[in-house]
């Protein structure tokens, strides 16, 4: 088994029940992962988690799911403990969780700010910290951020600002974990064609993005397709091992950096 192949590896995906996380779980299992552990936030996602577990198991891989609100004290550490208890080891850790808010700075409350930084910054930091403790040597650690890190746009100050911290966490962790052969990176998708994006947008904004293909000659809708992100994730946690400390914007040229 190659050190950097997905074959035979154990994977943990936070936010792995549906949307991008669920598709990553299915894809890595199809490409040879031995065990896939998915996390989901609340009981409302339990049906999605079960569907993803079934899809993963159909590939021949083992699959486990754990529900947790990762913003609660100790929840991220507990997730890693449960993963190791279930799978025995951990080779690849991927954090896809996040929360988006579209609101002018003047209208953003302290509660809004705290909620955004709790999930997008604090949980992301804790995930990197715990992954660093528990990943096997030559492991892979990947965070999902946002292409807004390369955008000049209003209204997403707390979302993009909270995700911006993860870019530095990624650089720092790559230096600290590099001696063990662990690569640490982040991927920033463009606005994706999922409820995560649409839930924050007014109909006019959705229509604009759907007609904005001219902004990216590779896009048919102006939005990033989830299917287009998954191969980049797979690459970063396998053959892309020589890349580390990087935040890669994957959006068909929607924004650049």
At which residue positions do the language-model features occur?
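Short, small/polar-rich loop/turn modules that mediate ligand/substrate recognition or access, typified
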Residues: 178, 183, 243-245
């Amino acid at each position: 088994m190659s050190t950097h192949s997905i074959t035979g590896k154990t994977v943990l995906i936070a936010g792995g029940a549906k949307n991008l996380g669920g598709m990553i779980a299915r894809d890595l299992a199809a490409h040879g992962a031995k065990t896939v552990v998915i996390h989901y936030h609340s009981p409302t996602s339990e049906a999605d988690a079960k569907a993803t577990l079934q899809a993963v198991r159909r590939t021949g891989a083992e699959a486990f799911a754990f529900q947790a609100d990762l913003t609660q004290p100790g929840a991220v550490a507990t997730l890693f403990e449960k993963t190791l208890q279930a799978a025995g080891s951990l080779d690849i850790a991927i954090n896809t969780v996040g929360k988006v808010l579209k609101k002018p700075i003047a209208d953003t409350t302290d509660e809004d700010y705290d909620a955004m930084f709790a999930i997008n910054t604090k949980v992301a930091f804790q995930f990197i910290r715990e992954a660093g403790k528990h990943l096997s040597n030559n492991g892979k650690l990947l965070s999902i951020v946002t292409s807004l890190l390369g955008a000049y746009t209003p209204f997403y100050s707390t979302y993009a600002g909270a995700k911006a911290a993860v870019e530095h966490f990624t650089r720092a962790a790559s230096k600290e974990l590099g001696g063990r052969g662990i690569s640490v990176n982040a991927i920033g998708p463009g606005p994706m064609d999922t409820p995560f994006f649409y839930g924050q947008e007014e109909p006019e904004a959705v229509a604009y993005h759907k007609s904005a293909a001219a902004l990216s000659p590779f896009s048919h809708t102006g939005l990033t397709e989830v299917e287009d992100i998954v191969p980049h994730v797979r690459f970063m946690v396998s053959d892309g091992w020589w890349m580390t400390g990087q935040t890669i914007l994957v959006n068909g040229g929607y924004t650049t950096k």
